[in-house]
């Protein structure tokens, strides 16, 4: 027997035993249509998050224009800033050789996960405005799985970055062999494989359901629904929040003790300054992630344990938690621009290219063409050399 924990539940809204909110929404984790179905007041505001309709139940009517405009404006800002910022981060890391460090390889992975997450916002916006999911089952599966992949890959990558910082600060000798771009790429692949442990099952569980003339994108659970629903919530809370936060806390606790006890880490003031700067940047990124994601995780667990009455404060706080989760996907590029001089310089060169930058790009293209067409380059060199000799021979004598 299949059922959903989100708005895709086929039960009628008037049924007091309904397991989920009656309003449709895309099946993303932040929208929680598959994790956080409202079990206490199924006809209340859609608990599925920003992407769901405020109230499509018979008692409440259509969502207000102010709510719709506010949510759409927020979605648009997060989507544009998130996509542009994260793609710019990935471009800078790929484009500039000096940016291909182990830490930046992890940042690339984080930017990729955030870009994928923000790319789902247009679908969720359309779903919100139309009150139905018009994109079919395949896109439903993709959107839901992307949000799970983003959540797990992001926190796993931040965990990895914290461990990487710990090794760099507390074990600098071992760091020389371990902290390489090649190893960072391997670790990134492993993070995506680990995320597949939840991402792939969710993709198979995602489906579309018809309910009262509309289509819902939601997850289906085997009987008993309440057991599998709560099990998923608990697994997400433990493996995507509690355990990673504990690992991150231990790593930074040990780093702080090390930095306080040792005045010089590498024997060079310049290297120490860079080491502390990068450590500070990673710490800020991790802290912002935890601040943005803690409310939604706590909210989901509380609603799984107790019944929360529908009030204006509950509605506002729920939407605030959802907004924080999505906003995190567009904050990281801003943090890099303010906290890392290399990123700041590369961003500036991309947005406002100087003459030296253009000359450097042209010389890079020439070198690439020379490597790709060595015979042509040799011919041009010989021709130029012959012309120089000819000019020297035909030049008038003094």
UniProtKB/Swiss-Prot annotation:
GO terms for cellular component: axon; dendrite; dendrite cytoplasm; dendrite membrane; endosome; focal adhesion; GABA-ergic synapse; membrane. Changing residue 351 to A: No change in palmitoylation. GO terms for biological process: acute inflammatory response to antigenic stimulus; adenylate cyclase-activating dopamine receptor signaling pathway; adenylate cyclase-inhibiting G protein-coupled acetylcholine receptor signaling pathway; adenylate cyclase-inhibiting G protein-coupled receptor signaling pathway; adenylate cyclase-inhibiting opioid receptor signaling pathway; behavioral response to ethanol; eating behavior; estrous cycle. Keywords: Cell membrane, Cell projection, Disulfide bond, Endosome, G-protein coupled receptor, Glycoprotein, Lipoprotein, Membrane, Palmitate, Phosphoprotein, Receptor, Transducer, Transmembrane, Transmembrane helix, Ubl conjugation. The chain crosses the membrane at residues 67-91, 105-129, 141-163, 184-205, 229-253, 278-304, 313-336. Glycans are attached at residues 9, 31, 38, 46, 53. Its main location: membrane. Residues 92-104, 164-183, 254-277, 337-398 are cytoplasmic. Disulfide bonds join 140-217. Residues 1-66, 130-140, 206-228, 305-312 are extracellular. A lipid is attached at residue 351 (S-palmitoyl cysteine). It is a multi-pass membrane protein. The modification Phosphoserine is found at residues 363, 375. Forms homooligomers and heterooligomers with other GPCRs, such as OPRD1, OPRK1, OPRL1, NPFFR2, ADRA2A, SSTR2, CNR1 and CCR5 (probably in dimeric forms). Interacts with heterotrimeric G proteins; interaction with a heterotrimeric complex containing GNAI1, GNB1 and GNG2 stabilizes the active conformation of the receptor and increases its affinity for endomorphin-2, the synthetic opioid peptide DAMGO and for morphinan agonists. Interacts with PPL; the interaction disrupts agonist-mediated G-protein activation. Interacts (via C-terminus) with DNAJB4 (via C-terminus). This is Mu-type opioid receptor. It comes from Rattus norvegicus (Rat).
């Amino acid at each position: 027997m299949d059922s959903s924990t989100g708005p895709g539940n086929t039960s009628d809204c008037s049924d007091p035993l309904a397991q989920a909110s009656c309003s449709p929404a895309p099946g993303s984790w932040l929208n929680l249509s598959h994790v956080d179905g409202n079990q206490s007041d199924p006809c209340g505001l859609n608990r599925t998050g920003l992407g769901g309709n405020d109230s499509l139940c018979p008692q409440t009517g259509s969502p207000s224009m102010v709510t719709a405009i506010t949510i759409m404006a927020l979605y648009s800002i997060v989507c544009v800033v998130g996509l542009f910022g994260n793609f710019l981060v990935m471009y800078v890391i790929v484009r500039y050789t000096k940016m291909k460090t182990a830490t930046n390889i992890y940042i690339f992975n984080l930017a990729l996960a955030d870009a994928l997450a923000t790319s789902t916002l247009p679908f969720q916006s359309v779903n919100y405005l139309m009150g139905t999911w018009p994109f079919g089952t395949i896109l439903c599966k993709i959107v839901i799985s992307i949000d799970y992949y983003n959540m797990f890959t992001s926190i796993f990558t931040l965990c990895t970055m914290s461990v990487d910082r710990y090794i760099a600060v507390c074990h600098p000798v071992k760091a020389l062999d371990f902290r390489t771009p090649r190893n960072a790429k391997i670790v990134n692949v492993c993070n995506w494989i680990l995320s597949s442990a939840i991402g792939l099952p969710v993709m198979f569980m995602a489906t579309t359901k018809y309910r009262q003339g509309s289509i819902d994108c939601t997850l289906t659970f085997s009987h008993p629904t309440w057991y599998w629903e709560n099990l998923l919530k608990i697994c997400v809370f433990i493996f995507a929040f509690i355990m990673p936060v504990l690992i991150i806390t231990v790593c930074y606790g040990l780093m702080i003790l090390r930095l306080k006890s040792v005045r010089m880490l590498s024997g060079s003031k310049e290297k120490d300054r860079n080491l502390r700067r990068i450590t500070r940047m990673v710490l800020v990124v991790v802290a912002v992630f935890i601040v943005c994601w803690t409310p939604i995780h706590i909210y989901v667990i509380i609603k799984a344990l107790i019944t929360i009455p529908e009030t204006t404060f509950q509605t506002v706080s729920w939407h605030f938690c959802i907004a924080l989760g999505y906003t995190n996907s567009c904050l990281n590029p801003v943090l890099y621009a303010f906290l890392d001089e290399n990123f700041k310089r590369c961003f500036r060169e991309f947005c406002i290219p100087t003459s030296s930058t253009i000359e450097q790009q042209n010389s890079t293209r020439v070198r690439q063409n020379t490597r790709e067409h060595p015979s042509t380059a040799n011919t041009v060199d010989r021709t130029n050399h012959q012309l120089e000799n000819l000019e020297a021979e035909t030049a008038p004598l003094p």
